[in-house]
């Protein structure tokens, strides 16, 4: 029997990947986390799509030209990238490495396709699926967003059930009903706390 010990819990930084279907509220949840000044490093996705009216360069996305995006691919400077609905999205590696080196938990927001790509490269990341309570609410959110053409809306609604089928590939699920963002944020922070209490902590290598 061990009667004397000196236990120091390892505090290895985490790479958290938040994903879910379009319209589930990924941007809104992360924005609320930033408002609450939670101690996380938020990685800004790079994209070639057009900036929406209320989006801010360098905050919501890094908006670049397709030629610049292709250059990043050629330099192997993207953790993952994908063509989503005709636009390119990618996660830059450099800020992730820097944040992890300084001991910060890193949070990345990607679509479901992107999460699958990251899991192949960094299987020890923490994968969180943000889930709508039902399809009707997801449809209402996309319609009220007023940023989608009829064709784009139809495509996103058709894709959502296929994305939700990927739920078993994730570690955790957080349901995000309309008007309950703070609950979703609290659940994500609980996941982070639990991960830091693991007997065998995750080790992230890029």
UniProtKB/Swiss-Prot annotation:
One of its GO terms (molecular function) is guanylate kinase activity. GO terms for cellular component: cytosol. It is found in: Cytoplasm. InterPro entries: GK/Ca_channel_bsu, Guanylate_kin-like_dom, Guanylate_kinase, Guanylate_kinase_CS, P-loop_NTPase. PROSITE patterns: GUANYLATE_KINASE_1, GUANYLATE_KINASE_2. Its EC number is 2.7.4.8. Keywords: ATP-binding, Cytoplasm, Kinase, Nucleotide-binding, Transferase. ATP binds at residues 20-27. It comes from the Bacteria. NCBIfam families: guanyl_kin, PRK14738.1. Essential for recycling GMP and indirectly, cGMP. Belongs to the guanylate kinase family. This is Guanylate kinase. It comes from Dehalococcoides mccartyi (strain ATCC BAA-2266 / KCTC 15142 / 195) (Dehalococcoides ethenogenes (strain 195)). The lineage of its organism: Bacteria, Bacillati, Chloroflexota, Dehalococcoidia, Dehalococcoidales. The gene is gmk.
